[in-house]
Design a protein with these regions (language model features):
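Structured soluble/peripheral alpha/beta segments that form catalytic or ligand/cofactor-binding pockets
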Residues: 1-196
Length: 196
């Protein structure tokens, strides 16, 4: 009976892992869907916040469908969203993993536009775009860590408090960034039973 109670009450599973992932990786082994995010709140006006969100390998859900890429496998798509409170036209991009995405030794390269280099506790995130570019050095902190694991290791989620330092360029203006944020990393198996 205790087994079923533990499956229902998952609160015991929080923070039951290493303090941070040893290495961020792309699709590997049974983990086919990889999520990375950087969230920096409380930036001065007109920025207010900065969000970076990537999903490498798509779950089989219509909301993630990228038919314009002409890809038959949802797992071969990577999507990236970078936004601030300022109006931005090019904040969302989808990439063909086979042709526009490269992963090598903790370096995630999304067609040269967004590049994430992670050698924890140090991370560097750059974005080269005509409208919104940035260069950030990120250091994860020992405080403010959270880990959650789905039953049977179907998925894992890390959230790490971090200090961000760098610059953001938008519409000819340069904005310095020196702020705390949150770095997230998650991985899961491909839940192939989701309706398409």
């Amino acid at each position: 009976m205790q087994l079923f109670q533990d499956l229902i009450n998952r609160a015991k599973q929080f923070n039951q892992a290493p303090t941070c992932p040893e290495q961020l990786h792309a699709q590997q082994g049974r983990y086919k869907i990889i999520h990375q995010a950087l969230k920096i709140p409380n930036l001065p006006a007109p920025l207010h916040y900065l969000n970076f969100y990537s999903l490498i390998g798509q779950p089989r859900a219509p909301i993630f469908e990228q038919s314009h890429l002409n890809i038959t496998q949802a797992l071969d798509v990577a999507t990236v969203l970078v936004s601030t409170s300022m109006h931005s036209v090019g904040h969302f991009h989808a990439y063909d993993i086979q042709q526009q995405f490269e992963y090598q030794d903790s370096l995630f390269n999304f067609d040269g536009r967004e590049i994430l280099s992670a050698h924890l506790p140090h991370v560097r995130f750059t974005r080269n775009d005509d409208e919104l570019s940035l260069d950030l050095n990120i250091k994860t902190l020992d405080s403010g860590r959270c880990f959650y694991q789905l039953p049977w290791s179907l998925g894992q989620f890390w959230s790490l408090s971090c200090q961000c330092l760098g610059q953001l360029h938008y519409a000819g203006q340069t904005y310095p960034i020196e702020q705390r944020g949150v770095l997230e990393y998650a991985r899961s198996i491909n839940f192939a039973y989701l309706p398409f």
